[in-house]
């Protein structure tokens, strides 16, 4: 049924005609997410008619069908103006039972009405900055969190819980003030941690939770993880007190469980991704819960520590490395978590090094060539995205105990140069972190070839032919002067800039490097002091 015909039916004021028209329109457009521009004005007219009645109040028997029509129209981004007034948003909040102030529309406990209203609000908040502002001003997050807090005591339909959480996610993703309000005023981390515990089936009695999460629980858990990520992204900074640390460690144990279980359907990797993203927001000292599981018969044990979680994160990393797009979002969070675990815990670092950087045997292949995990990570070290190459290089550097020679050995100087330059370690240096002395066992193959390995490429290379063979001394001098002239021209035209190494290990212009070196020599020479 066309929107013009529905609008004309609504204008008749005849109840049966109106409801039949709306019912027909809803059935025809239930799966419509794109709309014909030619009918845009008709849809706006219909939206205005629906909103005017919505704000005045609907009879209980008409609410679901009426709200379904509003939901369909709210998908059209060009038709949102009638729905984004303070009065219409207040009416929808009342029907969703999340209004903090009493409106002219009576609250409804009908879960079908609540669900349709929540869907309408989600559409509006997603697409309209005005609706986002009005929802924040109306403090919808307050009543939403109140209802979320009742999930343990009362039974709510899955869809209502899901869209409660989805609306929370949208509000916290799009409004900084709502993020802060949920984090600070409403104690959102504790509330949502309890809700996640309930959703995962973790019981206070310590009974083992299910290892396969059903599909509905998976959907809700992912929304909870996304909201928690939003509110902790910028809020957890520096040191936390003992009470907060205990809360984050408890959350960490739940996230540890998340990365160890599978989900119904094909959403396991997506679910693990949200858990890993949130792990990256936790205070660093709370990540120790990833290594506190007691070893058991089927666990991966290393140096007396259960490495099941670290192994699961490595498997997840390998899956993400197969992706060719959005690598920053795919691999940066898990690499950051693994890096911090390796930095703080020697058993984790040694286990990861054994898996990622096993003793070198193949010394004739460049480090970035191949399908081993080491090869894939070294390739990332020269990725166009600076964040991707930074986290990949940082991870491998920590696995090498921040030893520059060891890092170059496994990656090649050419690949390592970016991180070394950023840290002022181009000329070598000592690591910043506190690392115990780890032995780096060289294989016989590496020992035999070590003297022939090109440190820049990280592999044994055939000696190239001498390009000056057969030239006279005059010809060699002529070619050398041509080269000097070419470099001088490139330098004068600022195509290239000659670089040198400063005494502090940083790359700098050659002129500045020479000046800095001379200044240091003069300052250290006792004969240079004034008389």
From Swiss-Prot:
GO CC entries: cell cortex; cytoplasm; plasma membrane
| Residues recorded with modification Phosphoserine | 436, 502, 523-524, 528
InterPro entries found in the cross-reference section: ARM-like, ARM-type_fold, Chaperone_Ric-8_A/B, Gua_nucleotide_exch_fac_Ric8
- Which one GO biological process term can you cite for this protein? adenylate cyclase-inhibiting G protein-coupled receptor signaling pathway
Q: Which residues carry this modification: Phosphothreonine?
A: 441, 443
Instruction: Give the record's keywords alphabetically.
Output: Chaperone, Cytoplasm, Guanine-nucleotide releasing factor, Phosphoprotein
Q: Which Pfam families match?
A: Ric8
Name the domain of life.
Eukaryota
The entry describes its oligomerization and partners as:
Interacts with GDP-bound G alpha proteins GNAI1, GNAO1 and GNAQ, and with GNA13 with lower affinity. Does not interact with G-alpha proteins when they are in complex with subunits beta and gamma. Interacts (via C-terminus) with RGS14; the interaction stimulates the dissociation of the complex between RGS14 and the active GTP-bound form of GNAI1. Interacts with NCS1; interaction is favored in the absence of Ca(2+) and myristoylation of NCS1 is not required.
Q: Which family does it belong to?
A: Belongs to the synembryn family.
Q: What is this protein called?
A: Chaperone Ric-8A
Species the sequence originates in: Homo sapiens
């Amino acid at each position: 049924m066309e929107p013009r015909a529905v609008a004309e039916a609504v204008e008749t004021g005849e109840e049966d005609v109106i409801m039949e028209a709306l019912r027909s329109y809803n059935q025809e457009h239930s799966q419509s997410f794109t709309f014909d521009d030619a009918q845009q004005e008709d849809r706006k007219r219909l939206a205005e008619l629906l909103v005017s009645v919505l704000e005045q109040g609907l009879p209980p028997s008409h609410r679901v069908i009426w709200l379904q029509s509003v939901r369909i129209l709210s998908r059209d981004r060009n038709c949102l103006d009638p729905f984004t007034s303070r009065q219409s948003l207040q009416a929808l909040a009342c029907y969703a039972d999340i209004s903090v102030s009493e409106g002219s529309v009576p609250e409804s406990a009908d879960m079908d009405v609540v669900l349709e209203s929540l869907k309408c609000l989600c559409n509006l908040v997603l697409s309209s900055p005005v609706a986002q502002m009005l929802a924040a001003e109306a403090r919808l997050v307050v009543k939403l969190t109140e209802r979320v807090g009742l999930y343990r005591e009362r039974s709510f339909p899955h869809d209502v819980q899901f869209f409660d959480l989805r609306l929370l996610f949208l509000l916290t993703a799009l409004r900084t003030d709502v993020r802060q309000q949920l984090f600070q005023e409403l104690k959102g981390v504790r509330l949502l941690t309890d809700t996640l515990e309930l959703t995962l089936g973790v019981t206070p009695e310590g009974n083992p939770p299910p290892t396969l999460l059903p599909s509905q629980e998976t959907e809700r858990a992912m929304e909870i993880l996304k909201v928690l990520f939003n509110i902790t992204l910028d809020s957890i900074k520096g040191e936390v007190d003992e009470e907060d640390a205990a809360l984050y460690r408890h959350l960490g144990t739940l996230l540890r469980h998340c990365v160890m279980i599978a989900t119904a359907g094909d959403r396991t990797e997506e679910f693990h991704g949200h858990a890993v993203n949130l792990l990256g927001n936790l205070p660093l000292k709370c990540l120790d819960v990833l290594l506190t599981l007691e070893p058991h018969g089927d666990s991966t044990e290393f140096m007396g520590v259960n490495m099941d979680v670290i192994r699961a994160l490595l498997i997840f990393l390998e899956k993400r490395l197969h992706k060719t797009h959005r690598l920053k979002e795919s691999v940066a969070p898990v690499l950051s978590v693994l890096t911090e675990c390796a930095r703080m815990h020697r058993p984790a670092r040694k286990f990861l090094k054994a898996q990622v950087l096993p003793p070198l045997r193949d010394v004739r292949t460049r480090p970035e060539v191949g399908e081993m995990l080491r090869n894939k990570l070294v390739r990332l070290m020269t990725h166009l995205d600076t964040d991707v190459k930074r986290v990949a290089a940082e991870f491998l550097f920590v696995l090498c105990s921040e030893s520059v020679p060891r890092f170059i050995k496994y990656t090649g100087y050419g690949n390592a140069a970016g991180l070394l330059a950023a840290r002022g370690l181009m000329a070598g240096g000592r690591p910043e972190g506190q690392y115990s002395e780890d032995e780096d066992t060289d294989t016989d193959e590496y020992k035999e070839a070590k003297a022939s390995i090109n440190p820049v490429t990280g592999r044994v290379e055939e000696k190239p032919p001498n390009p000056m063979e057969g030239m006279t001394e005059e010809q060699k001098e002529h070619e050398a002067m041509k080269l000097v002239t070419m470099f001088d021209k490139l330098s004068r035209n600022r195509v290239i800039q000659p670089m040198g190494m400063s005494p502090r290990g940083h790359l700098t212009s050659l002129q500045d490097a020479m000046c800095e070196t001379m200044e240091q020599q003069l300052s250290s020479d006792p004969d240079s002091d004034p008389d």
